[in-house]
Amino acid sequence: MIRSRWIPGPEPRGDGPVVVSRTDFRVHRIVDLPRACLAGWRLSGLWPELAGAIGVWLWADLPRRRIGSVSVWRAESDLRAFVRHPLHVEIMRAYRDRGTLTSATWDSPAAAGRR
């Protein structure tokens, strides 16, 4: 498994509760994996300026054709705003038929946003 460094957002980690989101995308065909990985890296470039973003890790399990992220947010409304971001929408539309996406979101103490 490959994991990125922690990519910080503009929000401080703080002491309050946070929202954590985990995504796991498994591409149907190996040929789609490189571009899907690049799309994820492209999205991570938004992190330093995303309102409410505390940070994100990206990961890839290449033998299993899986990629994903664990992101930490100040509030669920901030996560929802990211989901509506034009670049995120564009990428999701481009890949929705090329794999299977699972995700989970939960509230957690602020320690989840600390390394």
Stretches found by the model and what they are:
Residues M1-R66, D78-A81, S103-R115:
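Short S/T/G/P-rich N-terminal loop/turn motif that feeds into the first structured element of a domain
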Residues V70:
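Ligand-binding pocket scaffold of soluble enzyme catalytic domains
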Residues E76-A104:
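An amphipathic, aromatic/His-enriched active-site/gating alpha helix that lines ligand/cofactor pockets
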